[in-house]
Amino acid sequence: MKDAKDLGVDMFLLDDGWFANKYPRKDDHAGLGDWEATKSKLPDGIPGLVRDAKKTGVKFGIWIEPEMVNPKSELFEKHPDWVIMQPKRDTYYYRNQLVLDISNPKVQDYVFGIVDRIMTENPDVAYFKWDCNSVITNIYSPYHKENQGNFYIDHVRGIYNVLTRIHKK
């Protein structure tokens, strides 16, 4: 961080690649959904980087994309039913990832929990870069079952619900 500060940097953004342990993020094929710092890359975790940034007078930001998941992740292994995916059909992957079904309140709680944990453990995080930029493919909500017509509306409402909870915190 000191070298960055010496160059005039006033904010450091930790981008994609900092997370997952069982399937560490090395490229876009694994790890998305497992939002814990990779121990081999960041032995002091996010708190260590935030402390270093604060000591040197650099603001710290972090990249997240908590509404997405790679099939090669612990989250997908535990909760394949949390993914927007048509049953008994070929799955289309956009950038080797799938969209979580944020119309599902359990998924909303999970996504909120990711941001809440980072903010709670690292109150000096100044900035979140939340991509939320994927198209929705494989359109089918396991949560809605027979009521698929409400999916898009409830998906957007789910995102708003998560953002409202974050804002209130």
Where are these regions (language model features)?
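Catalytic domains of carbohydrate-active enzymes, especially glycoside hydrolases
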Residues: 1-21, 121-123
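Catalytic cores of extracellular degradative/oxidative enzymes
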Residues: 2-6, 20-52
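Hydrophobic faces of well-ordered beta-strands that scaffold small-molecule active sites
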Residues: 10-14, 60-64, 128-130
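Active-site-proximal loop/turn and secondary-structure-junction residues that shape catalytic pockets
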Residues: 18-20, 64-70, 132-136
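Non-catalytic terminal segments and appended small domains
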Residues: 20-24, 28-29, 69-70, 80-89
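Short, solvent-exposed loop/turn and secondary-structure capping segments
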Residues: 23-25, 72-75, 139-141
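Active-site neighborhood of glycoside hydrolase catalytic domains
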Residues: 38-57, 77-169
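Glycine/proline-rich, flexible active-site/cofactor-binding loop segments
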Residues: 59-81
